[in-house]
Amino acid sequence: MAMAATSSTQTNLFLKAPFNPQQNCQQTHFLPLNFKIRNPISRITCSATPTATAVSTTTKIDQRSEERVFNFAAGPAVLPENVLQKAQSELLNWRGSGMSVMEMSHRGKEFTSIIDKAEADLRTLLNIPSDYTVLFLQGGASTQFSAIPLNLCTPDSAVDYIVTGSWGDKAAKEAAKYAAVSSIWSGKSDNYVRIPNFDGSEFVQNSQARYLHICANETIYGVEFKKYPVPANPDGFLVADMSSNFCSKPVDVTKFGLIYAGAQKNVGPSGVTIVIVRNDLIGNAQKMTPVMLDYKIHADNKSLYNTPPCYGIYMCGLVFEDLLNQGGLVEVEKKNKAKAQVLYDAIDESNGFYKCPVEKSVRSLMNVPFTLEKSELEGDFIKEAAKEKMVALKGHRSVGGMRASIYNAMPLAGVEKLVAFMKEFQAKHA
């Protein structure tokens, strides 16, 4: 607690050194006995209220807002400012509980209400049917690369993977340790700039495959499935890594056996992994499956088998509430399409000064990679953009160039500012 009695750094009182009666009081810098604290502890209040309040959809413009940058990072990524402000207001005292969410027992009634509401709001957002289970897990989407085959098939089960980028490739390689994986299509030879046709002309599915796996949006290369393939096996099902476009648009959950996503790109901070899995697929884990990867263990314990990432789940809940307040995912998708169109138009209308290599039909609404015709200027572009408070525009190390990640929480104003900068930069260097 800061005390305003003096501008001296000695106002931390006894924190500086323990009392020693042998020392000269003048040397230990104790304040006089008649010193009075202007703001005693008993007068500290918290802006949080005992009852739950909706996250405001209007971002408060103040000095803090003006000091914030436009963050185009791929993840962890920008969060809605009004959500951050809501979390700030509840940090010390969550809704009259007298404690922070960070301090709560994960088995207490307070956190139970938080995780239950987060799940309920997510179910509303995605219209998740009752025959699907929602799990809040840890370990990132990368851990699910192992958990999925361990839970959904035997070591001899055939499974198909469509590889449209680095994450799909990593998922297939990891799954090969636990199942008979076939990468039935890969875009690697084309540098992952497209998605195959589903009419059977470009790949052939195994009719016995237990599941078909896709990465719905490849963060690094900026390719996104606009429609989804149907497994050739009538008893098979579709599995999707939706980490980087989760809750960015409506999705028919019933078309999937399992959806998984790391939260840190679109719905929260890093540390939370969300799995949406059809109930009949739970309970068939291979014997070798570690307890922390067993969906049944987590489902039976309502994501509380061990201590979950409580604060991360709380933040996800605030984001879900905010998305609902915006009108749901139909409205969110409209905003995302508008933002992406502004940026892609600027690239396409630059007469080749900027280039996006991805086929237009599958360009991501979330991650926009682009290069400069004069590649030697890319470093200057990134540095000058940072001076204008637009950060994290450097492309992935495996690709180079630039990448603007424009997730749900990136406002249109951020994209418009980037486009204005791009035009100015082009005029200067064309």
From Swiss-Prot:
What processes does the entry annotate via GO biological process terms? Answer: L-serine biosynthetic process; L-serine metabolic process
Query: Which Pfam families does this UniProt record tie to the protein?
Result: Aminotran_5
* Main subcellular localisation: plastid
> What keywords are annotated for this sequence in UniProt?
Amino-acid biosynthesis, Aminotransferase, Chloroplast, Plastid, Pyridoxal phosphate, Serine biosynthesis, Transferase, Transit peptide
The Gene Ontology CC terms held by the record are: chloroplast stroma; cytoplasm
GO molecular function, one example?
O-phospho-L-serine:2-oxoglutarate aminotransferase activity
Q: Which free-text remark accompanies the cofactor?
A: Binds 1 pyridoxal phosphate per subunit.
Question: Which superkingdom is the protein from?
Answer: Eukaryota
Residues that bind L-glutamate: 107
Q: What is its EC number?
A: 2.6.1.52
Q: Tell me what this protein is called.
A: Phosphoserine aminotransferase, chloroplastic
- As recorded in Swiss-Prot or TrEMBL, the protein's gene is named PSA
